[in-house]
Amino acid sequence: MLLSARYSRFCLVPWSDAISHPRELDAYARACFENLYGQPLDDWRIVLSPEPAGAARIATALPEALLQRLQALGRESRLSLRSVQPYLMAAYNRCSAQLEQGDFLFVLAEPRRSVLLLAAGGAWQQVLAQGCADSDQALQALIERTCELYGEHLPRVYLHAPGRGEVPQLAAVQLCQPASDADPLCAMWRAVA
């Protein structure tokens, strides 16, 4: 099952030489989320991207109550829920072979919400989830603002926008073609299936 960014929280977890145990890493990631969102995520499940020593990680938090409810619905329906993951990670993993190494901005444009992953020098620099109008102008402004905030020249931009009815007219590499029907959820499913 893929979850929209509406149900997920994302955070960059910087490398720390002081961490030597998985429990310490989990506590550190929770502290990073609390610092970013201003509240503890005690009832959220946190998963970190596997990165080499010295590199920042992307952390994803999913509400534990939502995960438990999905498990219960699966049992009630006699279905086996094998995987629950943020759509961002599924889309990035599916598209990663198309991305050139080095500096880039990966943009997942969901309906009314976009998530941006900024990489430089082969390491994650930022992850940002932002409400965004469903227009090319709003998306282009978000991309430019993100690059300005982090002092980066406009890197190569990869756009994954499967719910759009038309190909966005942006200076970006399109990672999937728009769906033939207007259901963005169905389009997202097809894009990462």
What function would you assign to each model-found segment?
Residues 1-193:
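Hydrophobic/aromatic-enriched cytosolic interaction surfaces used to assemble or bind macromolecules
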